[in-house]
Amino acid sequence: MIIGIGSDLIDIRRVEKSIERFGERFTHRCFTEVERARSDRRANRAASYAKRFAAKEACSKALGTGIAQGVFWKDMGVVNLPSGKPTMQLTGTAAVLLEAILPAGHRAAIHLTITDDYPLAQAFVIIEALPESP
């Protein structure tokens, strides 16, 4: 069953300006080490960061909090499954909130899609509760 849905649309130019103005202070504050390593290898670095920023916003909305209630940017990170499919890895308060909305006897599957078409980047997150195997 679906227990959370979130979406976000961001202007890549806004992220470009943040990177230009704050540099590593911005990227280290908002992104995990895995996200920074992946984005810094990209030809269009700002678009890669923007997609990940949008994914965090969408995930926080799917959790029902937004960036509030002790949820920090680095509590949510975009990671890839072995198949290459993106998903979200939650830690800290975000992980606690996810556990709180999960029905008993269920585990979470976080579905993520991210895309960009300059000057916009977009993300959708669906949090699904799946019955645990016996």
Curated annotation (Swiss-Prot):
Keyword tags: Cytoplasm, Fatty acid biosynthesis, Fatty acid metabolism, Lipid biosynthesis, Lipid metabolism, Magnesium, Metal-binding, Transferase
Enzyme class (EC, first level): transferase
Residues noted as binding Mg(2+) in the record, renumbered to the chain: 8, 57
Pfam families, alphabetized: ACPS (PF01648)
Cofactor(s) it depends on: Mg(2+)
Primary location recorded for the protein, binned into one broad class: cytoplasm
Catalytic activity: apo-[ACP] + CoA = holo-[ACP] + adenosine 3',5'-bisphosphate + H(+)
Superkingdom: Bacteria
S-S bonds: none
Any one Gene Ontology molecular-function term assigned to this protein's record: holo-[acyl-carrier-protein] synthase activity
GO cellular component: cytoplasm
BP-aspect Gene Ontology terms: fatty acid biosynthetic process
Key word ATP-binding present: no
Coiled-coil regions listed: none
The enzyme's E.C. designation: 2.7.8.7
Subcellular location: Cytoplasm
Family per similarity comment: Belongs to the P-Pant transferase superfamily. AcpS family.
Function: Transfers the 4'-phosphopantetheine moiety from coenzyme A to a Ser of acyl-carrier-protein.
The protein, known as: Holo-[acyl-carrier-protein] synthase
Lineage: Bacteria, Pseudomonadati, Pseudomonadota, Alphaproteobacteria, Hyphomicrobiales
